[in-house]
């Protein structure tokens, strides 16, 4: 595709925001002209894979209308194909007649979400009275799915829009399916309004109120072993119009992945620390406070003070802004991924909300070195790419299998609704370049691959992989070959014979799913990318080095030099274990920071087998 713009650090990029080894380095960003997509809905698009390597795309809609079986206005749509592009093609070529269109749905699709929405644990607890102008007390959407490596169960985040109260509120609950989406259950509440969910028909409210936390965006962080959930709240005037998106706050909470999103595992980021909060009384709003996170150009601390409180602050929303007590966060509705080229987290916010609601606005990118103590700095602004979309997500443009996970030097960012060239939906590909990037062929950094238990990855003279424990006479040279695009090849060759190099990846696979399934056997092959750099065998031979971070609740973190190697194609980790049977000693496994102790574990790998040192 033809590149239509270039941004250079020092003009539209501040050098302070870049991951650079010296002050002379610059980051440039080129991006393509927008290309249309057809999967658009009233949410971002979410992508994940199950234990068989099957790819799923899902999105959601919950219109303020009565349910009809003849449309998808109250549906969680699921599709399956080789990857996102396959789903996009299915939708593009499908019939406009809904009875025919439904035939391309995956069985996980929920056609009528109303019974789920109006009978959640939160609805049963707070018992909304209902509002005459609305058909239902709650409109809800499924936002992201994570697959439990112990059971294969699906867990997801539910965005609630509660119209049964006056005024309305947002909230977040947890959903679960134990049969790949055939049946869903809303199991418990994660987040409401920290100031309570008061109905003005029952008790007096102040001049403004907190709308509650919703619109969750999930990031699964393999570095720290935490789920990070970014979510948005609003400050609204109780009387009169304050602008639906005029006074938005951004927050983040986190929970250990091992806790499987259970309510009592979450902590909110507040004043630079991760604090526990009350998860018992939903009507009290899960009372823990959460800071409004902002970029460092607004506050060097990374969050705004003073903290909004409707019980102690007087004035309308605009008056509170004028008093310096409220700010519309520039990070509202952010999507987050790890950029392995920059070695930083990258975020894309919704661009145009604010007190003036001016419509289309340039797209901005922010980066932070840490999520433990986030300091989001603006990396650059695409001044000629203007949209107003809330619904964004990022993907690796080669794999196209996981949303908002790991991206590299080139990545794809999607826009749904109110986009630049194709109003309904589009994407652009962005390519970054660091001026300090080597212009010569990368050298191999020799290393030994040893896991936390002391197992060492080796190979015999016929390039058959073996795993030994303790000292070994390894006659092979092992190393990491930096592709300089955010990805590595794991390579091996007989000592002194680099011309006989082999590459580590999935070699025995008949289909795309086989390359991506849990337990896929890993082997060595010659020149996997020679024929087709976009092929599964090439992508499965590429790895991301993710350093392990011990993240503390006080906002500090420690790196001990250990790391995981994450497969580019599948998002699974390299796992090797000398205690396993021979054909399962070197495999791909889902992320683990804990061991499954049941006899029915779907994935039986151990956490130590994927932590390298």
Predicted regions and their residues:
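Bacterial N-terminal signal peptides that target proteins for export
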Residues: 1-9
């Amino acid at each position: 595709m033809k590149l239509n713009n270039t941004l250079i650090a020092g003009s539209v990029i501040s050098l302070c925001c870049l991951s650079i080894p010296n002050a002379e380095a610059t980051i440039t960003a080129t991006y393509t002209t927008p290309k249309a997509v057809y999967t658009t809905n009233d949410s971002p698009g979410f992508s994940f894979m199950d234990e068989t390597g099957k790819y799923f795309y899902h999105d959601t809609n919950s219109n303020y209308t009565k349910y009809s079986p003849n449309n998808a206005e109250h549906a969680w749509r699921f599709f399956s194909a080789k990857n996102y592009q396959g789903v996009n093609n299915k939708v593009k070529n499908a019939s406009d007649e809904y009875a025919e269109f439904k035939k391309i749905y995956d069985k996980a699709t929920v056609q009528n979400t109303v019974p789920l929405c109006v009978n959640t644990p939160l609805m049963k607890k707070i018992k909304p009275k209902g509002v005459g102008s609305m058909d239902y007390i709650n409109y809800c959407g499924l936002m992201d799915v994570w697959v439990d490596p112990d059971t294969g169960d699906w867990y997801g985040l539910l965005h609630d829009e509660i119209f049964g109260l006056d005024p309305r509120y947002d909230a977040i609950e947890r959903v679960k399916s134990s049969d790949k989406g055939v049946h869903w259950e809303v199991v418990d509440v994660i987040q409401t309004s920290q100031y309570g969910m008061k109905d003005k028909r029952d008790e007096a409210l102040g001049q403004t109120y907190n709308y509650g936390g919703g619109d969750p965006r999930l990031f699964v962080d393999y570095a720290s072993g935490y789920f990070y959930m970014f979510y948005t709240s609003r400050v609204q005037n109780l009387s009169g119009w304050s602008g639906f998106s005029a006074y938005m706050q951004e927050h983040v909470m986190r929970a250990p992945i091992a806790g499987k999103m259970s309510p009592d595992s979450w902590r909110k980021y507040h004043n630079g620390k991760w604090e526990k909060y009350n998860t018992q009384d939903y009507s009290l709003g899960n009372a823990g406070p959460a800071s409004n996170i902002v970029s460092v150009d607004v506050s060097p601390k990374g969050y705004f003070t003073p903290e909004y409180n409707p019980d102690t602050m007087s004035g309308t929303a605009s008056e509170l802004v004028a008093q310096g007590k409220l700010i519309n966060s520039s990070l509202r509705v952010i999507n987050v991924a790890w950029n392995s080229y920059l070695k930083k987290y990258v975020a894309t916010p919704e661009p145009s909300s604010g007190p003036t609601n001016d419509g289309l606005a340039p797209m901005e990118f922010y980066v932070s070195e840490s999520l433990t103590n986030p300091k989001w700095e603006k990396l650059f602004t695409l001044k000629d790419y203007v949209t107003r979309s809330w619904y964004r997500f990022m993907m690796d443009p080669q794999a196209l299998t996981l949303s908002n996970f790991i991206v590299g030097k080139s990545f794809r960012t999607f826009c749904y609704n109110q986009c630049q060239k194709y109003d309904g939906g589009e994407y652009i590909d962005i390519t970054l370049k660091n001026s300090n990037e080597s212009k010569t062929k990368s050298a191999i950094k020799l290393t030994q691959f040893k896991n936390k238990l002391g197992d060492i990855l080796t190979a015999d003279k016929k390039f058959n992989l073996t795993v030994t424990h303790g000292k070994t006479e390894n006659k092979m040279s092992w190393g990491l070959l930096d592709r300089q695009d955010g990805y590595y090849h794991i390579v091996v060759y007989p000592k002194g014979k680099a011309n006989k190099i082999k590459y580590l990846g999935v070699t025995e696979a008949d289909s795309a799913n086989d390359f991506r399934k849990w337990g896929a056997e890993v082997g060595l092959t010659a020149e996997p990318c020679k024929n087709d750099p976009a092929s599964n065998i090439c992508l499965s031979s590429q790895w991301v080095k993710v350093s392990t971070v011990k993240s503390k609740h006080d906002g500090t973190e420690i790196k001990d030099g250990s790391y995981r190697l994450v497969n580019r194609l599948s998002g699974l980790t390299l796992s090797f274990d000398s205690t396993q049977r021979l054909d399962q000693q070197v495999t791909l496994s889902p992320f683990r920071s804990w061991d499954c102790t049941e006899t029915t574990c779907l994935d039986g790998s151990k956490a130590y087998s994927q932590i390298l040192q």
